[in-house]
């Protein structure tokens, strides 16, 4: 190799007159090749990771798009825990464990093919021996790992989901489990779920760690066998024997890491099959694209000037049971309407239909003669303010909580909404006022103040209609009375629809809709319904309302 004459025909422009210069040239060439190779591999790693991250981004974005834009009835089929699990966890595991490992597998297969291919050109026997070694190694490893990784694939997704559910159950219900003194029960459930999942993780880690040692043993055996073969073939030429043996050693030790990575990739691909299957099923069930996307920035509205009419509204979550049956009533501008009934009467479902979250199976809703449909309901929503039973408080400032969902925040409108909700005096005591941050779980706001914050959020957009869905059910009597008085004040400029099962909230309404088993029993004032219906009068007595 160091003979200058060997290179004279290939690089005549370089004068090589001794072995030292030749050695330096070879050294520089090898250095350049390795530097170039490593720069190229670094670039490939960057491209590969970017490709995988973009893929994860696209998949999670598709899921989020579906959960946000799809019809509300469709998204109700997936629980909140499963939605978080699909977006936050399963996508990363599936893409990293399957796609990323698949790319690593392909890269290392190419490396092995190139090494063996180059060997075949000049050294067919060592190349054949190397190919045989690779084939035998992969066969033996797959024979050992295939069934074992199949077991991982069948159980890993299930165990991981149980583990995540146990975490969520403990964290979300911390207050209740402390009151029940059930800390040990829930902790034991968590540790059991974690133990099962960690056992699977241990096996996966073990299977990932075994291949290097397994391949190293096979290399030693292969080298001993090759030494015997090459010695017999090149008995008359020691230099040829050394060269052939050196080439095989170099090839095997270069191929060995690639074989390790290939086997690790195969193990990870096999163990994440269930995650890939689940994400494919979820992706297919999403029916992406089968929904309309409306631009809220256009601020298109249906102006409410006179009357909203509900005609023969029927709805069911499944064909077996009808939740709403022929619901018909009118809402005049300026009305303070209460919808009353026991749990299961269909009150909240009716609110969801009024807001367009759920489409009625039959019947129609008219706003000043304009029929609402899925194509124009978004215009009607722009004049609606909605106050839920449980407010979602964000870990942001008060003004960001009030103006939630708006790109640009108007401080004057925030203050106006807070004053209308009778909360501004409380917030003004904070150091930074409406710019003060609310920390979830330790914000110091009472339940009544949180509900006022929800009302301020609903009032921020200056809606013409306010819908309260069981908004006072979690409040004590005094706070409920204060909010009811506040609603009386607001009702002078808004149309209010209040849904409740507590009569004290609705006594101030000018019209009450009494519901039972998905039907409207009657519509009238508080006194009229109390006089006509013993069931209603019994509710009055139970509520201790005089």
PLM feature spans:
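Loop segments that connect adjacent transmembrane helices in multi-pass transporters
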Residues: 76-82, 155-203, 271, 276-279, ...
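Cytosolic ends of transmembrane helices, especially the final helix of ABC transmembrane type-1 domains
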Residues: 178-182, 206-209, 254-284
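Transmembrane helix-loop-helix hairpins at lipid-water interfaces of multipass membrane proteins
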Residues: 1-36, 120-132, 236-242
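Helix-to-loop junction immediately C-terminal to a conserved catalytic motif
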Residues: 355
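Juxtamembrane loop-to-helix connectors within ABC transporter transmembrane domains
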Residues: 68-114, 172, 196, 209
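Conserved "ABC signature" C-loop
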Residues: 388-437, 535-538, 544
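Transmembrane helices of ABC transporter permease
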Residues: 103-155, 225-240
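ABC-family ATPase nucleotide-binding domain "signature/switch" substructure
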Residues: 382-385, 390, 401, 417-420, ...
């Amino acid at each position: 190799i160091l003979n200058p004459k060997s290179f004279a025909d290939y690089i005549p422009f370089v004068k090589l007159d001794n072995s030292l210069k030749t050695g330096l040239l070879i050294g520089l060439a090898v250095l350049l090749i390795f530097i170039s190779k490593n720069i190229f591999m670094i670039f490939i790693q960057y491209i590969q990771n970017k490709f995988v991250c973009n893929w994860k981004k696209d998949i999670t974005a598709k899921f989020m798009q579906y959960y946000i834009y799809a019809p509300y009835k469709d998204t109700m089929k997936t629980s909140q825990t499963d939605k978080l699990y699909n977006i936050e966890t399963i996508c990363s595991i599936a893409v990293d464990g399957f796609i990323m490992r698949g790319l690593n597998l392909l890269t290392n297969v190419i490396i092995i093919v190139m090494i063996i291919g180059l060997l075949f050109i000049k050294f067919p026997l060592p190349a054949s021996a190397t190919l045989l070694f690779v084939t035998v190694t992969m066969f033996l490893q797959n024979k050992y790992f295939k069934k074992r990784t199949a077991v991982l694939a069948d159980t890993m997704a299930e165990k991981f989901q149980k583990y995540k559910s146990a975490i969520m159950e403990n964290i979300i219900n911390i207050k209740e489990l402390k009151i029940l003194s059930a800390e040990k029960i829930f902790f034991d459930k968590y540790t059991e779920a974690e133990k099962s999942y960690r056992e699977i993780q241990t096996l996966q880690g073990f299977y990932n760690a075994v291949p290097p040692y397994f391949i190293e043993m096979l290399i030693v055996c292969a080298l001993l066998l090759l030494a015997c073969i090459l010695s017999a073939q090149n008995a008359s030429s020691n230099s040829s024997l050394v060269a052939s043996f050196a080439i095989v050693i170099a090839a095997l030790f270069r191929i060995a890491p690639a074989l390790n990575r290939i086997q690790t990739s195969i193990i990870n691909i096999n163990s994440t099959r269930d995650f890939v299957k689940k994400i494919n099923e979820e992706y297919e069930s999403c029916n992406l694209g089968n929904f309309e996307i409306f631009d809220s920035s256009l601020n298109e509205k249906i102006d409410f000037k006179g009357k909203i009419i509900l005609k023969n509204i029927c709805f069911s979550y499944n064909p077996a049971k009808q939740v709403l049956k022929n619901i018909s009533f009118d809402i005049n501008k300026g009305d303070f309407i209460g919808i009353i009934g026991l749990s299961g009467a269909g009150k909240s479902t009716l609110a969801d239909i009024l807001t367009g979250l759920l489409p009625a199976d039959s019947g129609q809703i008219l706003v000043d003669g304009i029929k609402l449909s899925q194509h124009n309901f978004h215009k009607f929503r722009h004049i609606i303010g909605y106050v839920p039973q449980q407010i979602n408080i964000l870990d942001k400032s008060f003004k960001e909580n009030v103006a939630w969902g708006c790109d640009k925040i108007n401080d004057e409108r925030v203050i106006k909404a807070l004053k209308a909700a009778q909360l501004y005096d409380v917030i003004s005591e904070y150091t930074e006022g409406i710019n003060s941050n609310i920390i979830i779980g330790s914000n110091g706001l009472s339940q009544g103040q949180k509900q006022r914050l929800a009302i301020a959020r609903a009032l921020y957009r200056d809606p013409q209609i306010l819908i309260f869905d069981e908004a006072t059910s979690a409040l004590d009597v005094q706070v409920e009375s204060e909010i009811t008085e506040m609603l009386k004040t607001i009702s002078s400029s808004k149309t209010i629809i209040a849904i409740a099962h507590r009569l004290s909230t609705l006594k101030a309404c000018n019209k009450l809709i009494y519901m039972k088993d998905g039907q409207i029993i009657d519509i009238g004032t508080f006194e009229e319904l109390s006089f006509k219906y013993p069931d209603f009068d019994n509710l009055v007595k139970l509520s201790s309302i005089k």
